[in-house]
């Protein structure tokens, strides 16, 4: 059991008999009374996000998970296929189980497969990934003076804002937690 005041983004808990990933957790105190812990939880199986308020001091069970290194192989329809690096077993995860991580997956990339009771329930991405720009506006001389950026589409379909000097075909690093441009690869 973990106290709700200790919940942090990325943790997995069991709530209403389902496994949830904590997307946000913040503490709110009201006058003299005890505080509230406001959380945003994402159901690992269904992908639904719900907001739950816990009274300060409550405890929730932490989900017992295991992580195994795996390699992303390919996508076939609505399923993404991974191979564990220790025993070379293949696992398929649905698009709902992958969630927004699909925008960062490139074939042969290494990820952590998340298991609960021997069943894969999701993946953990590395902090940054290298992706290729496939579509962006051309840059013009003097664009860098104004700062800001321009929209770009990456090889996985992810749309982000990049600096003006980035061109089509450039490899860039993207933060998987925020979806923002980090730098050139």
UniProtKB/Swiss-Prot annotation:
Assigned keywords, A-Z: Cytoplasm, Elongation factor, Protein biosynthesis
One GO BP: peptide biosynthetic process
Highest taxon above the source species: Bacteria
SMART domains assigned: EFP, Elong-fact-P_C
Major location category of this protein: cytoplasm
Cited function: Involved in peptide bond synthesis. Stimulates efficient translation and peptide-bond synthesis on native or reconstituted 70S ribosomes in vitro. Probably functions indirectly by altering the affinity of the ribosome for aminoacyl-tRNA, thus increasing their reactivity as acceptors for peptidyl transferase.
PANTHER family, per the entry: ELONGATION FACTOR P, ELONGATION FACTOR P (EF-P) FAMILY PROTEIN
HAMAP family in alphabetical order: EF_P
Name of this protein: Elongation factor P
Originating organism: Thermotoga petrophila (strain ATCC BAA-488 / DSM 13995 / JCM 10881 / RKU-1)
Recorded name of the encoding gene: efp
């Amino acid at each position: 059991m973990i106290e709700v005041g200790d919940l942090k983004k990325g943790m997995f808990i069991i709530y209403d008999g389902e496994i949830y990933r904590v997307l946000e957790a913040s503490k709110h105190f009201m006058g003299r009374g005890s505080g509230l812990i406001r959380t945003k939880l994402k159901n690992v199986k269904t992908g639904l996000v719900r907001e739950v308020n816990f009274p300060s001091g409550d405890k929730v069970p932490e989900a017992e998970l295991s992580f195994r290194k795996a390699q992303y192989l390919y996508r076939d329809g609505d399923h993404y296929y991974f191979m564990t690096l220790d025993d070379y077993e293949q696992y398929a995860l649905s698009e709902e189980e992958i969630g927004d991580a699909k925008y960062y997956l490139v074939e042969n990339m290494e990820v952590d497969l998340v298991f609960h009771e021997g069943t894969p329930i999701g993946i953990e991405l590395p902090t940054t990934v290298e992706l290729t720009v496939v579509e962006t506006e051309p840059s013009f001389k003097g664009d860098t003076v104004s700062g800001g950026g321009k929209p770009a589409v990456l090889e996985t379909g992810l749309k982000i804002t990049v600096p003006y000097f980035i061109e089509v075909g450039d490899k860039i690093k993207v933060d998987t937690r925020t979806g923002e441009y980090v730098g050139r690869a």
